[in-house]
């Protein structure tokens, strides 16, 4: 796969692994251009997954890459708070636009769409999964080199939706050194490998 790959095979004649799997993924917003999608996962909560997502984006931004973070943790979003973002995301006829942090990192989170960031999101799994999918299909990710997807812990509806809907190029697994955590992390890694085998991810 070319380093310039945007996962849009409609205007590309190159033969690569991305072309074989691309039809199974949801198309991004027509105005988006995302080169690499990196999932950040963990077996359990409280291990610093969201902080890792933020630090990875900051590190790559300092290297000159344009980065974005898709906050897929719908019921426990923390990315806007980490970047000190309190505004509301805006939308127009092209789609919904992420809010840019002071470092130039594009951020989209459910907390940027609700009136009060402390209001709970009491949605069932399919609705949450649908919202995450819309963060990919409806949000304009403009000229993003690396899009980090901060997922909720575990192997539930949201991680499954991300692997099925987005062209994930790789994952970062965040863990703490406990035996129980290691076992749960193994589940997350095995899930990623399973999705790779059936052509849903490039990890």
Regions found by a protein language model. Give the residues of each.
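Walker A/P-loop phosphate-binding motif and the immediately C-terminal alpha-helix
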Residues: 31, 36-74, 189
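A short, basic/flexible loop-to-alpha-helix module at the beginning of a structural domain
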Residues: 25-32, 136-138
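Conserved catalytic-core segment of NTP-binding enzymes
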Residues: 145-202
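Residue-level signature of catalytic and energy-coupling elements of molecular machines
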Residues: 34, 45, 71, 79, ...
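Phosphate-binding/switch loop-helix module in NTP-utilizing enzymes
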Residues: 114-162, 181
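Phosphate-binding loop that captures ATP/GTP phosphates
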Residues: 66-67, 72-117, 129
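Signal for well-folded cores of large energy- and translation-related assemblies
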Residues: 17, 39-42, 61, 80-87, ...
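Cysteine-cluster motifs in flexible loop/terminal segments that predominantly coordinate metals
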Residues: 1-28
């Amino acid at each position: 796969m070319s380093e310039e790959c945007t996962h849009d095979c409609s205007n590309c004649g190159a033969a690569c692994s991305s072309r074989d799997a691309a039809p199974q993924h949801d198309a991004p917003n027509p105005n988006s251009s995302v080169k690499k999608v990196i999932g950040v996962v963990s077996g359990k909560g409280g291990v610093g997954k969201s902080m890792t997502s933020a630090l990875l984006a900051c590190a790559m931004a300092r290297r000159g890459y344009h980065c974005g973070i898709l906050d897929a943790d719908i019921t426990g979003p923390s990315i806007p708070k980490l970047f000190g973002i309190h505004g509301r995301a805006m939308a127009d006829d092209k789609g919904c636009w992420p809010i840019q942090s002071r470092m130039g990192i594009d951020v989209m989170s459910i907390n940027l769409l609700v009136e009060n960031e402390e209001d709970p999101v009491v949605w069932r799994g399919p609705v949450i999964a649908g919202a995450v999918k819309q963060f990919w299909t409806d949000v304009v990710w403009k000229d993003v080199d690396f899009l980090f997807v901060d997922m909720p812990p575990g192997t539930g509806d949201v991680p499954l939706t991300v692997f099925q809907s987005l062209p994930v190029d790789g994952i970062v697994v965040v863990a703490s050194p406990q035996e129980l955590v290691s076992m749960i992390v193994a589940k997350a890694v095995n899930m990623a490998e399973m999705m790779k085998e059936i052509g849903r991810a490039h990890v």
